[in-house]
Design a protein with these regions (language model features):
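Disulfide-rich extracellular domains of secreted proteins
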Residues: 1-211
Length: 211
């Protein structure tokens, strides 16, 4: 999924780790909200385990999303690899100017639950109307790539060691600045990973010591 729009300013908030639920994210928004989307990363344990993830925004009701493992076909659920979930929520109508608190939870503590249920991250992207003026253009590419070296998918050998996203910037003039934010959930021990923009390496190599 890709969203493209023009607005005044964008803000990104997140909590990262590999934490037992519930996991909370608190942040302040200074201006009027125009668009917001929240993402929750969940570790399933295996592609066979099922369960659910829930998101509560500003003391509202919990929005639960069922997780069906390798059989998942929900539009807002991206599951890859050995049960790595990335779940998206439209939170435009729920976040507000001022202080916000989001709480993510899973079925980890339910009786007879098999889903691992630990949470990789809770991330919210907010586009606001900045009264100070100016105009920005945004591309938000949404998905979950299972990057890996030599491996197996069932009995089929596989390799998927790169993913490419293209942003159509032709015709844009007068660019004064640009920013790129990438969320990286998991890797294999000892495997170096890189982030390139127009062939230029723009990130430090991620190692086991940087988690």
């Amino acid at each position: 999924r890709r969203d493209e729009f023009r607005a005044s300013s964008s803000l990104t908030f997140g909590t990262y780790g590999w934490l037992d639920p519930p996991v909370s994210l608190a942040f302040d928004i200074p201006y009027e909200v125009q668009w917001a989307r929240t993402y929750v990363g969940v570790w399933g344990g295996t592609p066979r385990y099922t369960g659910w993830v829930g998101l509560e925004v500003n003391n509202g009701s919990v929005t639960k999303t069922d997780l069906f493992g390798k059989d998942d076909k929900s539009e807002n659920v991206y599951v890859t690899g050995y049960g790595v979930y990335w779940v998206a929520y439209d939170t435009t109508s729920q976040v507000k100017t001022g202080h916000n608190t989001l709480i993510a939870t899973t079925s980890k503590n339910d009786p007879n639950n098999k889903l691992d249920g630990r949470i990789y991250a809770v991330v919210t992207v907010v586009v606001v109307k900045d009264p100070r003026g100016g105009s920005s253009r945004y591309w938000i590419a949404e998905g979950n790539e299972n990057l890996h070296g030599e491996g197996w998918s069932g009995t089929t050998p596989t390799k998927h060691d790169e993913a490419t996203v293209t942003f159509p910037v032709a015709g844009i003039t007068g660019i004064s600045s640009s920013n790129l934010t990438v969320v990286y959930l998991a890797s294999a021990r000892g495997q170096p990973d890189y982030l390139l923009l127009n062939i230029q390496d723009i990130g430090n190599t991620l190692t086991d010591k940087k988690k």
